[in-house]
Amino acid sequence: MGGVHLSNTPVAAVTADAPAVARHLSRAFVDDPMMRWFFPSDETRPERLERYFGTLFTRQYGLHGRCERTDAAAAFWVPPEGAEKAVPDEETVRLLREILGDRAELFGEAVAAAAAHAPQEPHWYLAVVGADPAARGRGHGSALLRSGLAEADRAGLPVYLESSKPDNLPLYEHFGFVVREELRLPGGGPALWAMRRAPR
């Protein structure tokens, strides 16, 4: 990616973008503590993550969320009106179980534990944001954050996210997020920081 100009302007992510979106996010999350826990094999993690994010995009967030991308990053947001719909259906659960293999049960427990701590007030949820490491530091993630946060601000609503990567907390804090609590996932999983940003 060195000599190629990659636009960091957010655009709506459509179905045809699925391969690129999945690739960017798999590269972004390959060293993420939670993804390392769900996909412990260094050898198979990149390919499984690509399938995982591709499935989430095409079968869940792309249908009921607000998905944006740049030329090297992607973000999945869920506005309050999409919250009840942006849950995996039976076929999506089957596909995710296949991708996760023997970690599927742990994954289900972790998702349920995190969901139990989600705010009850109407809010926007930042489900995923990530940039290809080869393009980090070039404003891709920040541009996607600004775009989604502007939508939430226009609606006068707070934004909620969870992160398992301590290195990312300062970036989120820069954008106005505050840690609400630190969660310990069942089954010896990594710490998960629940963060909230008040509307501006």
Label each PLM-derived region with a short phrase.
Residues 9-23, 27:
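A short beta-loop-alpha structural element at the N-terminal edge
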Residues 23-42, 56:
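Helix-loop element at the rim of GNAT/NAT acetyltransferase active sites that forms part
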Residues 42-65:
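Active-site rim helix/loop that mediates acceptor-substrate recognition in acyltransferases
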Residues 68-132, 136, 186-190:
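Conserved acyl-donor/pantetheine-binding loop and adjacent beta-alpha core of acyl/acetyltransferases
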Residues 123-124, 145, 177-200:
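Long, positively charged, glycine-interspersed low-complexity recognition regions
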Residues 142, 154-155, 165-182, 188-189:
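Conserved active-site alpha-helix within GNAT-family acetyltransferase domains
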